[in-house]
Amino acid sequence: MTLRPLHDKVILKREEVETRSAGGIVLTGSAATKSTRGKVIAVGTGRLFENGSVQALAVKVGDVVIFNEGYGVKSEKIDGEEVLILSENDILAIVE
């Protein structure tokens, strides 16, 4: 199945980041917090304004981003894999 986000929506796949405790122990499962990094796999056409103009998004497919996992982030299972659908406003930074 292919997803095509609308307007300023972005679809990303969460990147798992190895989490270590202060003592160097690798944390897994419930002891590890979910990563707020993801790889952009699809972007919408842009932010639509009331006057009808469209502003292109700052992120593109392939970008690795840090996002704010809050109220506006929607998690979906597509073909057995979790993807996140969020507004570009929920993206805090692009990792370069």
Swiss-Prot record:
The keyword NADP does not apply. This is Co-chaperonin GroES. Together with the chaperonin GroEL, plays an essential role in assisting protein folding. The GroEL-GroES system forms a nano-cage that allows encapsulation of the non-native substrate proteins and provides a physical environment optimized to promote and accelerate protein folding. GroES binds to the apical surface of the GroEL ring, thereby capping the opening of the GroEL channel. It comes from the Bacteria. It comes from Actinobacillus pleuropneumoniae serotype 5b (strain L20). GO terms for biological process: chaperone cofactor-dependent protein refolding. Belongs to the GroES chaperonin family. The keyword Chaperone applies. SMART domains: Cpn10. GO terms for cellular component: cytoplasm. SUPFAM superfamilies: GroES-like. Its main location: cytoplasm. GO terms for molecular function: ATP binding; metal ion binding; protein folding chaperone; protein-folding chaperone binding; unfolded protein binding. InterPro entries: Chaperonin_GroES (IPR020818), Chaperonin_GroES_sf (IPR037124), Chaprnonin_Cpn10_CS (IPR018369), GroES-like_sf (IPR011032). Keywords: Chaperone, Cytoplasm. It is found in: Cytoplasm. Heptamer of 7 subunits arranged in a ring. Interacts with the chaperonin GroEL.
